Amino acid sequence: MTAVKSVIRENYNMMKLREFLRENIKDSGFSGVEVEKNPRGTKITLHVTRPGIVIGRKGVGIRELTERLEKDFDLKSPQVDVKEIETPELYPGVMCNRMASHIERGTAFRRATMWTIQQIMEKKDAMGVQITISGKLRGDRSAFEKHTSGILPRAGHYADVIVLDDVVHVKTPMGLIGIRIRIARRDKFRKDFEMKAEKDVVPAPKPEHHDVKDETDPSAGTEAKDGAAAPKAGSESEQVEIEEEAMKSINTMEEDEEKLK
């Protein structure tokens, strides 16, 4: 086998592995997978939001997954490691799956898009986001819409370093719809250099002022207005069900046009 065919086959197997994991451990909040081959075997690292669902009771789930990966994908001595994602809203893979679940449940695609953008931009490390949705959105003809918020580098070194993207496809009664989410993360941004102040320069004292703190935290989007914490989801399916009620407060363009009439 030539080198070109070997690379193509390896990339094809990697694509099949991602699709298999996205479908089989979807409820655990699958974001991505890393495969590293060494003389001892194959190390597979799964990035998920809820590792307990993948591991299962007494490790039954991860053992079954390891056996299936070795059998179906011909991996030599696979060693599966699970890593938890601290902030799911900053990972395009997780948000793509959540948005696809909302559309499968019958939510309007624009409402799901606006809700996803809002959830991402509420995080302090989110610099920008772009969601592209294409397919049979409203009729027999295919169409696409692109929604952007914040700052999102399109080209250059920064675009390769700080921008993460993922694509997922969802089947609807109208046809197949593709969802692509690109997220620019501020925590991955590194400045080339920093200006240093001269040593003999003494900064002027800042005037003292007292801020009045509000009892409610505006950044806590998952908390209720009366101060009670929102119910915590045990899986991605429960998370989608919880978001369904909160998503009703977002108006789509069609609803805004009806109000203007």
Swiss-Prot record:
Keywords: Ribonucleoprotein, Ribosomal protein, RNA-binding, rRNA-binding. Gene3D superfamilies: 3.30.300.20, Ribosomal protein S3, C-terminal domain. InterPro entries: KH_dom, KH_dom-like_a/b, KH_dom_type_2, KH_sf_prok-type, Ribosomal_S3_C_sf, Ribosomal_uS3_arc, Ribosomal_uS3_C, Ribosomal_uS3_euk/arc. Residues 198-216 have a biased composition (Basic and acidic residues). Residues 17-86 form the KH type-2 domain. Residues 198-261 are annotated as: Disordered. It comes from the Archaea. GO terms for biological process: translation. One of its GO terms (cellular component) is cytosolic small ribosomal subunit. One of its GO terms (molecular function) is structural constituent of ribosome. Belongs to the universal ribosomal protein uS3 family. Binds the lower part of the 30S subunit head. NCBIfam families: PRK04191.1, uS3_euk_arch. Part of the 30S ribosomal subunit. This is Small ribosomal subunit protein uS3. It comes from Cenarchaeum symbiosum (strain A).
